Regions:
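Sec-dependent bacterial lipoprotein signal peptides
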Residues: 1-21
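Cysteine-rich micro-motifs
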Residues: 54, 97-106
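Short metal-binding segments enriched for Cys and/or His
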Residues: 109-117
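Short Gly/Pro-enriched turn/cap motifs at secondary-structure boundaries
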Residues: 120-122
Length: 142
């Protein structure tokens, strides 16, 4: 009985790894991100206030930086996650909280606070980048 368990565990682990690889096919392309933003510079002063956002170049389709609180930032890639092969990007709607892709892509919506899906057909959140905050510098990286 013991000899039978080892092959079953190996086969089970193999299928588990295969299924997790299939899920990664919907991930956005990996692009190295590593930059600093000085909020004292005129180009970035809008980020001095919670609830404001800024779109900068970088990532796969651009990057959205959102100031959540005085000490917290949310940084998301603009690459829509419904079907990454379409290459669609998200934009910030007029309410400043909702992100949406073009209707010809999927008409999905995400929330800027964490990148989670508000309305499908997309099921995956937007890719979130890491940040560190040492006033007035925000460091964004993956």
């Amino acid at each position: 009985m013991r000899k039978l368990r080892i092959p079953l565990v190996i086969v089970g682990a193999y299928f588990l790894m295969q299924s997790s690889c299939e899920q990664n096919n919907q991930n956005i392309p990996y692009v190295p991100v590593n930059f600093d933003i000085n909020l004292n510079l005129p180009s970035y002063t809008s980020l001095n206030f919670p609830g404001e956002h800024l779109i900068v170049q970088g990532g796969s389709k651009g990057i959205i930086i959102y100031r959540y609180t005085m000490d917290e930032f949310v940084v998301l890639d603009r690459h829509a996650t419904f079907d990454v092969t379409l290459g669609c990007h998200v934009a910030v709607e007029s309410d400043g909280i909702t992100l949406s892709d073009e209707s010809e892509c999927s008409d999905s919506k995400w929330i800027i606070l964490d990148g989670s899906v508000m309305q499908g057909p997309a099921t995956l959140p937007l890719h979130r980048y890491r940040t560190s905050w040492n006033p007035p510098i925000i460091h964004v990286y993956n």
